[in-house]
Amino acid sequence: MLHNIQSILQFLLFVSSVQALETGGLKSKPPNLKLLECFEFKKNYWIVGHAFHTSSVQFKDECLRMCLTSSIRKAKCLSAMHVPNDDECVISDQNQVTKPDLFIENDTPGTFTVNFFRNICVDPPDAEGVDRFEARLQGYKGGEGIIEFAQAVGKNTQVMVVISGLKENSLYEINFLPDTKEKGGQCHRKSRVNGEGKTLMIVETDHTGMAVEPWKVIDFDGFEENVISKTIVVVEKSTQTIVDCGSIRLATASSNSSTTRTSSSTGLKFTTGLLIILVVFLFL
């Protein structure tokens, strides 16, 4: 009888140990290194007065994901601030470059900590003289995202990818279909690539189903390919099934960060100055 009780207790101990190991494995997810590459970290600094979204998240990676995916909704995030004491995430359309006077140090680090992350994927590393294009993925099979292109004359194309809602820990091909011009968002009618098109890159999703590829130069000439209105498809590598797609368009003003805003502001000031000069001249 005693032997049977000991056997049962040993079995229960074994089961609880296995459950503890499984639970521990679930909690310790590997970091998405590509996600982290898109951010420049500075401890105990923040941007004052320019939050456009605040939410409750436990881990900093969740906050960084929110920042990157905001571009899918055409709300450009230039920085993210995570307050671990309060499980709070604040994303902003400004950073220490666009608003240096509002970038201040937390003067009460003993009370709470602020982790500041500048989004360095908002613009390509080589942004001088580039034209910007984008393909907004429609998410008709669950995934949604944006693929951004930047190219200057005589140089290869730079590409950046953010896609969420895909199958976790899986490989996907980003394919360019040169012979298709989709109208009215009908690219979802294709189900397989059947060997057509060109694979621009392969991306890997993390445990949340998110794929990130920071800006990288690829062997592709967008000008030569005349990419406007051509189709980009996201293909699950193992099955060669198309899971997402979008047509390439000129990037919207909100897709370009401080460069667009600065040039627009300069143009507005110049136009205003001309109007003032003209009015003064008329009244002389």
UniProtKB/Swiss-Prot annotation:
Keyword list (alphabetical) reads: Disulfide bond, Glycoprotein, Membrane, Signal, Transmembrane, Transmembrane helix
What the entry lists under CDD domains is as follows: PAN_AP_HGF (cd01099)
Xref: SUPFAM superfamilies: Hairpin loop containing domain-like
Where in the numbering of this chain does the Apple domain appear? 38-121
> Could you say which residues form the signal peptide?
1-20
Q: Which Pfam families match?
A: PAN_1 (PF00024)
The protein's recorded glycosylation sites are: N256
- Mind telling me which Gene3D superfamilies this protein's record contains? Hepatocyte Growth Factor
InterPro entries membership:
Pan_app
Q: Where are the transmembrane segments?
A: 264-284
Q: Which cysteine residues pair off into disulfide bonds?
A: C38-C121, C63-C89, C67-C77
Q: Record keywords: Zinc included?
A: no
Q: What kind of membrane protein is this, topologically?
A: Single-pass membrane protein
Q: What is this protein called?
A: Uncharacterized protein C34C12.7
Protein species of origin: Caenorhabditis elegans
Q: What is the lineage of its organism?
A: Eukaryota, Metazoa, Ecdysozoa, Nematoda, Chromadorea
